[in-house]
């Protein structure tokens, strides 16, 4: 037992526990976030006697007489100061790391009035941010120092909320001050805790499940198995091939497969009870990777499948083989890219309870509340489910699949009790789908002027233990493997294989990150072979408005690849002239689902009793700032002002289904739906006031029409729009480390330029990790890394100068010309870095993470 002070108040911790658990579970100070519980991420940072400390490390018995400060304990001046500074700098995206960053800022500024940039970077060195790339957080610290010194905090200059304005995001204050709720921040009366007992073998037959001892343990509410599921057992984003609970006689597919759900009154009892569930297995040989999966006599990951092929794609246009044979210059290379973990700061969590209407209400952190609703209804065999999105602490594609939401819904449905189901960080690293590793063989042919004549490729990937989005990822990898260039001879074959490894699925870039590394690396090598610069070969081949991509689509006037090349040229020329090692790469990425699949945006504008317009769209805000985008869309397309508008977080009973927050689609697709609703509202406002419109609903819907892959039309429209980018990397010749990155991105109409810059900076740093040192090793038992701190993520003091340049290219006739930017920010970075290292030491690197660099992690 210990007595100490929290935010100036004396408190007593009767049992010895981590400070994190005491602050959250007993005092419910939920600004202190639980990101890893292993002392790695920094999301739980507090101040102890004025010094930063990760609250998951110290035990309460060691804190006798100490003074602890959380964000809740800041002075009113400090709360206003940090809210303004972080909002003005554009430093807030998903927000999960921000309270910890704020306390690091306070600790620094309490000691140093005018900190240097090095001191600012050092102050947050122990705190990860996966969204921002740290650039704007450092700017926020700098601004906070200036304002604190001046003693005056201005009001945000946000009179104009129209498209193109760098306004503060809607959710800045609740994220900076930590009162906004993520699912784990809910503590409901009588709430129980649930967790799954998972397979001990990557591939085994479950022969028996003995739950008797676990059920008999005092404090255990229920132990559920497959026999208790009232609806269908299997779930899946596209294909229902993932057991919610493995039945007796069922086959496990990876170490994350759930077998039983334990529900208890408290977390300590929960962990004890899980150990009392006894599962009898018949271990079977596992499939460790695609090379094994290909073999005719390989074990089948799924009994019901003929082989281990999860998806096959073939894309062909023109005569690639003939064009390459006729080319003056030909290069062929093999490339490999690794597994990558999303490393979002917020582990998966869901809370469920019975609401006042008798529905199971799920409070979720996911990328589509309506997808969660669909899966839960199938599992329960009931329509009495509602899903309410909470704040989402990062996604990047990793929260598209079911992990905990359906389990929480099942527990509440069967027990009638409120429940919280949360993954530990080790479970999160195991369970949600990762970025696919790819193995790729590419051949490119060019004429004497460097004009691409043809490209031919063959790729395969490890999609792991279930389908997830493996097929669409493979398809996108193949359709974008040609690069953003104007030529017509292209062919690629792609295969995704089931294995008993953890599943792979959506990850920022959606397969394009992998094939872009190959095609852009080949283009850099080809430029050298011909004797022209990497910039020149791209400029000669760049797709321009009215031209055909290799998939046959004629691009529109909004196409801005040339503009990105022209904008980067002065920086590129200056680096070359200075004799610096510099690498260049370009990319394109679709905005919207495309390829003939359903791709809809829906939005309701409802005038409510407060005489304000409330925006309802069933689309998750996962850090990209969708709510702010939609408010700016309404201000731009109606006579209303910012104060007339309220953004409502996604739910499934009022907000219409707007599809997943993936595919860089929400700004364009749901943005256009919102614009259409605005047209109707504007017309109504010509004759009536908002008070007179009380209760009126203005509905907008947009269905993006595209052609299926392989459609028999001369110029298939694969996607409504593409974003384009060119990035360059400059190395310090002495240290071999990255000196700077310049990233130029075409976003159509920039809705919020500062927010766009933040997306770019975050994507660059994320792919620096992908290119240089992040790792997700999997051992011979198909078991992956289980420590967040060992992933190899970049920290604030390690990042180079990053210059983000936003190119405004009008022309798209939907969503006021706005194109999504979420994914393309991370796509060209790796090949640009690889080329810079070639310029440094003459070594062509074709495997990621790159070898023989100062960033290489030994013993990988």
Question: Which sequence ranges carry the predicted segments?
Answer:
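Flexible, low-hydrophobicity surface segments
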Residues: 145-307, 414
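Short beta-strand elements
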Residues: 46, 174, 180, 349-354, ...
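Phosphate/diphosphate-binding loops
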Residues: 258-259, 264-266, 417-464, 671-691
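Glycine-rich loop/linker segments at domain edges
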Residues: 90, 165, 171-177, 238, ...
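Signature of N-terminal electron-transfer/Fe-S-associated modules in redox systems
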Residues: 1-156, 595
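C-terminal catalytic domains of large/alpha subunits in multi-subunit enzymes
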Residues: 226-227, 381-383, 414-419, 448, ...
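Helix-loop-helix junctions that connect adjacent transmembrane helices in secondary transporters/permeases
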Residues: 296-378, 542-612, 692-717, 787, ...
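Intrinsic disorder at enzyme termini
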Residues: 124-183, 565-570, 574-578, 604-613, ...
């Amino acid at each position: 037992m210990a007595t100490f002070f929290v935010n100036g108040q004396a408190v007593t911790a009767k049992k010895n526990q981590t400070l994190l658990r005491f602050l959250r579970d007993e005092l419910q100070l939920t600004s202190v976030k639980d990101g890893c519980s292993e002392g790695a991420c920094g999301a739980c940072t507090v101040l102890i006697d004025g010094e930063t400390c990760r609250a998951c490390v110290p035990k309460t018995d060691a804190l006798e007489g100490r003074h602890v400060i959380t964000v809740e304990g800041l002075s009113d001046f400090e709360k206003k100061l940090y809210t303004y500074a972080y909002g003005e700098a554009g430093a807030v995206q998903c927000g999960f790391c921000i309270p910890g960053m704020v306390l690091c800022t306070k600790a620094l500024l309490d000691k140093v009035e005018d900190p240097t940039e090095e001191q600012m970077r050092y102050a947050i060195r122990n705190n990860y941010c996966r969204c921002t790339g740290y650039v704007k957080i450092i700017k926020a610290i700098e601004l906070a120092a200036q304002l604190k010194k001046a003693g005056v905090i201005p009001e945000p200059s946000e009179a104009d909320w129209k498209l193109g304005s760098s306004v503060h995001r809607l959710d800045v204050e609740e994220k900076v001050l930590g009162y906004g709720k993520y699912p784990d921040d809910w503590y409901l009366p009588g709430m129980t805790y649930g967790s799954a007992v998972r397979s001990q073998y990557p591939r085994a037959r479950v022969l028996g499940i003995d739950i008797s001892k676990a059920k008999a343990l005092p404090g255990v509410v229920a132990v559920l198995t497959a026999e208790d599921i009232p609806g269908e057992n299997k779930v899946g984003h596209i294909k229902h091939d993932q057991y919610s609970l493995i039945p007796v006689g069922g086959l496990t597919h990876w170490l994350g497969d759930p077998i039983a759900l334990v529900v208890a009154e408290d977390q300590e009892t929960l962990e004890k009870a899980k150990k009392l569930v006894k599962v009898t297995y018949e271990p079977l040989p596992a499939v460790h990777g695609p090379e094994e999966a290909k073999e005719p006599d390989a074990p089948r990951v799924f009994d019901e499948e003929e082989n281990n092929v999860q998806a096959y794609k073939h894309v062909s246009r023109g005569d690639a083989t003939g064009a390459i044979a006729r080319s003056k210059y030909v290069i062929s290379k093999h490339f490999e890219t690794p597994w990558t973990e999303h490393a979002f700061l917020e582990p998966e969590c869901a809370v469920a309870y019975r609401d006042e209407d008798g529905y199971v209400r799920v409070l979720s952190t996911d990328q589509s509340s309506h997808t969660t609703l669909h899966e839960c209804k199938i599992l329960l065999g009931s329509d009495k489910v509602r899903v309410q999105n909470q704040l989402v602490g990062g996604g990047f594609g990793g929260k598209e699949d079911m992990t905990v939401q359906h389990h929480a819904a099942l527990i509440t449905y069967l027990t009638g009790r409120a429940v919280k189901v949360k993954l530990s960080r080790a479970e999160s690293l195991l369970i949600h789908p990762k970025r696919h590793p790819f193995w790729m063989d590419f051949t490119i042919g060019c004429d004497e002027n460097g004009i691409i004549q043809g490209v031919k490729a063959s790729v395969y990937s490890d999609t792991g233990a279930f389908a997830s989005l493996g097929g669409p990822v493979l398809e996108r990898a193949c359709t974008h493997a040609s690069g953003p260039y104007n030529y017509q001879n292209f062919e690629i074959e792609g295969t995704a294989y089931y294995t008993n490894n953890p599943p792979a699925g959506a990850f920022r870039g959606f397969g394009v990150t992998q094939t872009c590394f190959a095609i852009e690396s080949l283009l850099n090598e080809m430029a050298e072979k011909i004797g022209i610069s990497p910039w020149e070969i791209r400029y000669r081949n760049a797709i321009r408005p009215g031209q055909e991509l290799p998939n046959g689509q004629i691009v529109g006037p909004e196409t801005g690849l040339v503009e990105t090349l022209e904008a980067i040229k002065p920086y590129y020329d200056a680096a070359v002239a200075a004799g610096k090692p510099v690498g260049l790469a370009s990319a394109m990425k679709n905005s919207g689902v495309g390829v003939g699949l359903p791709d809809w945006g829906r939005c309701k504008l409802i005038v409510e009793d407060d005489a304000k317009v409330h925006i309802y769209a069933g689309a998750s805000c996962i850090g990209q700032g969708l709510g702010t985008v939609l408010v700016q869309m309404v201000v731009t397309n109606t006579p209303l002002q910012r104060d007339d508008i309220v953004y409502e977080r996604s739910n499934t009973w009022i907000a219409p289904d707007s599809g997943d927050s993936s595919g860089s689609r929400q700004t364009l697709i749901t943005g256009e739906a919102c614009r259409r609703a605005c047209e109707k509202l504007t017309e109504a406002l010509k004759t009536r006031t908002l008070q007179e419109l009380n209760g009126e609903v203005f509905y907008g819907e947009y269905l993006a029409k595209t052609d299926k892959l392989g459609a028999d039309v001369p110029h298939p429209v694969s996607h409504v729009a593409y974003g384009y980018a060119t990035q360059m990397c400059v190395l310090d010749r002495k240290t071999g480390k990255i000196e700077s990155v310049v990233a130029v991105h075409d976003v159509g109409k920039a809705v919020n330029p500062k927010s766009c810059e933040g997306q770019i900076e975050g994507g660059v740093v994320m792919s620096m990790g992908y290119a240089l040192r992040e790792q997700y090793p999997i051992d011979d038992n198909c078991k992956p890394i289980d420590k967040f701190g060992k992933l190899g993520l970049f920290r604030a003091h390690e990042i180079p100068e990053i210059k983000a340049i936003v190119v405004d290219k009008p022309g798209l006739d939907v969503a006021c010309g706005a194109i999504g930017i979420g994914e393309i920010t991370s796509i060209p970075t790796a090949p640009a870095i690889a080329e810079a290292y070639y310029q440094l030491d003459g070594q062509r690197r074709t495997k990621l993470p790159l070898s023989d660099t100062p960033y290489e992690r030994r013993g990988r």
